C-alpha cells in the first residue's frame, strides 16, 4: 500500500502551498483532463481472485449481462453524474480550472487508486488548520461532482470546513468526471473505506486524529455502505453526518415514481402501484437497494442525521411528527423517519436535527451543527480516557 507520503507536505517550510511554484503547479494539475499520478494505492482483491471473476463472468453470459445492467441502471438513475456526457465534463473541467488559488484556502489535487479504480480527489484547507488533525470526508449526492463543490456550490464545502475548524477531502465516485471505472455498488463502498483509511494513515496518509464524514443524499447511503464492514480506528475520533438521506433506495425511488406518475399521468392508482412494485423489485434484483437504516443502527460512532422538517430553525427531533417532504424525498422514505419510528429509539450517540432547508438547499445554520460535532468529539475523548 504505498506510493507517496503526503503528510510532510501539509505544514511548515515543505508545505505544498509554501512553495514558490504553488499556483503554477496547482493550476497545471487542475487543468489535467486525466487522473494525476497516484498518491495512495490500496489493493483489496488478490490478483487470482480478480482473474477468476473476470473469466467466470466472460464464460457465463448471464453474469456479464447482469453486471452490464447494474452499471447502466446506475448511470441512468442511481448515479446520473456517471453517465458519459461530454458537455457536462467540459463544464466540470471549467469549474475545476477556475478555482481561486489566491484565496485563504489551499488546494491540492491527487489520485487514490483502489484496485483498478483511480479516484480523482482533492484536499482543501488553510495553513492554520492543515496540522490540526481534523478532516472532513465529503460524499456527494447522485447528480453532483466535487468540481461543483469547489465552484458554483463552494459554500457546501467551504462553510462546513470553516465552522467545523476542519480540512476537507473531496472526491468523485467511480465513473464521475475524471474518476475511472464504471459505477458499481460494492466498489463505491470500497472506495469510501479506502479514503477513510487514507485519512487516518499516519505513514502514507493524512494522519487524521478526528474525522467527520459528511454525506449528502446518496452520499449518506454510500457512507453507510462503506462503514458497514469497516473497522474504525480506535485512536481516531469520529462523527458522521447524513444530510437528507433515504431509508433505503427502493423505498425512496418508488415514492418518487409514484409522485411523478400521479402528477404527470391520468393512470389509475392500481396501475401506478403495479409500476412502483416493478420498480422496487428491479432495484433489489440488480443490487442497488442501498439500505441506510441498518448501517446507521449498527454504526459504532456518533451520528447526526439532518432532515427537512416543519421548523423555523434547527431543532432536535424526538419523533417524526414534524418531518415533511423535502422536494425530492418523501418524508416516509427518509432515514430520519425510519429511525424515529423504531420502537427501540435512537442510540445514545445519535441525534436527528430537523432543518427548514429543502433537499438540495445549502445549510443555513452550520454553527448549530458544529456545536453538536464539538460535543460529540469531547464525549469521545472522555470515553477514550476512561477506557
Residue ranges and their predicted role:
Residues 87-127:
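N-terminal cap/lid segment of alpha/beta-hydrolase-fold proteins
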Residues 115-163, 173-178:
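Short, surface-exposed "cap/lid" segments of acyl-processing enzymes
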Residues 173, 241-252:
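Active-site nucleophile loop of the alpha/beta-hydrolase fold
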Residues 214-223:
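Gly/Ala-rich beta-loop-alpha elbow adjacent to hydrolase catalytic centers
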Residues 362-387:
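Catalytic active-site module of serine/aspartate enzymes centered on a nucleophile-bearing elbow/loop
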Residues 250-251, 261-344, 360:
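The feature captures the conserved acid-bearing segment of alpha/beta-hydrolase catalytic domains
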Residues 182-204:
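Alpha/beta-hydrolase active-site loop
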Residues 1-63, 77-97, 384-387:
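Non-Sec secretion/translocation targeting segments of pathogen effectors
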Amino acid at each position: 500500500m504505498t506510493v507517496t507520503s503526503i503528510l510532510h507536505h501539509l505544514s511548515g517550510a515543505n508545505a505544498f502551498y509554501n512553495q514558490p511554484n504553488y499556483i503554477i503547479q496547482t493550476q497545471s494539475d487542475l487543468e489535467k483532463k486525466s487522473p494525476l499520478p497516484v498518491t495512495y494505492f490500496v489493493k483489496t482483491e488478490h490478483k487470482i481472485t480478480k482473474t477468476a471473476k473476470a473469466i467466470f463472468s466472460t464464460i457465463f453470459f448471464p453474469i456479464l449481462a447482469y453486471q452490464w445492467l447494474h452499471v447502466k441502471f446506475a448511470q441512468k438513475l442511481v448515479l446520473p453524474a456517471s453517465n458519459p456526457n461530454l458537455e457536462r465534463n467540459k463544464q466540470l473541467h471549467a469549474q475545476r480550472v477556475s478555482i481561486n488559488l489566491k484565496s485563504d484556502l489551499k488546494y491540492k489535487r491527487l489520485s487514490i487508486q483502489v484496485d483498478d479504480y483511480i479516484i480523482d480527489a482533492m484536499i482543501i484547507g488553510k495553513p492554520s488548520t492543515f496540522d490540526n488533525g481534523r478532516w472532513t470526508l465529503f460524499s456527494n449526492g447522485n447528480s453532483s461532482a466535487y468540481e461543483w463543490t469547489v465552484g458554483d456550490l463552494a459554500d457546501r464545502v467551504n462553510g462546513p470546513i470553516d465552522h467545523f475548524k476542519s480540512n476537507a477531502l473531496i472526491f468523485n465516485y467511480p465513473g464521475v468526471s475524471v474518476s475511472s471505472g464504471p459505477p458499481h455498488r460494492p466498489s463505491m463502498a470500497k472506495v469510501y473505506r479506502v479514503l477513510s483509511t487514507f485519512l487516518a494513515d499516519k505513514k502514507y496518509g493524512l494522519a487524521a486524529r478526528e474525522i467527520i464524514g459528511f454525506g449528502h443524499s446518496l452520499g449518506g447511503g454510500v457512507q453507510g455502505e462503506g462503514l458497514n464492514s469497516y473497522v474504525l480506528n480506535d485512536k481516531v475520533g469520529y462523527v458522521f453526518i447524513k444530510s437528507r438521506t433515504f431509508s433505503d433506495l427502493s423505498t425512496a425511488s418508488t415514492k418518487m415514481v409514484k409522485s411523478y406518475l400521479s402528477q404527470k399521468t391520468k393512470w389509475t392508482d392500481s396501475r401506478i402501484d403495479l409500476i412502483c412494485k416493478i420498480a422496487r423489485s428491479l432495484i433489489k434484483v440488480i443490487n442497488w437497494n442501498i439500505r441506510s437504516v441498518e448501517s446507521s443502527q449498527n454504526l459504532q460512532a456518533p451520528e447526526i442525521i439532518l432532515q427537512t422538517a416543519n421548523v423555523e430553525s434547527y431543532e432536535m427531533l424526538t419523533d417524526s411528527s414534524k418531518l415533511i417532504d423535502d422536494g425530492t424525498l418523501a418524508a416516509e422514505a427518509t432515514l430520519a423517519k425510519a429511525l424515529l419510528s423504531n420502537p427501540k429509539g435512537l442510540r445514545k450517540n445519535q441525534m436527528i436535527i430537523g432543518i427548514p432547508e429543502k433537499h438540495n438547499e445549502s445549510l443555513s445554520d452550520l454553527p448549530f451543527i458544529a456545536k453538536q460535532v464539538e460535543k460529540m468529539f469531547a464525549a469521545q475523548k472522555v470515553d477514550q480516557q476512561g477506557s
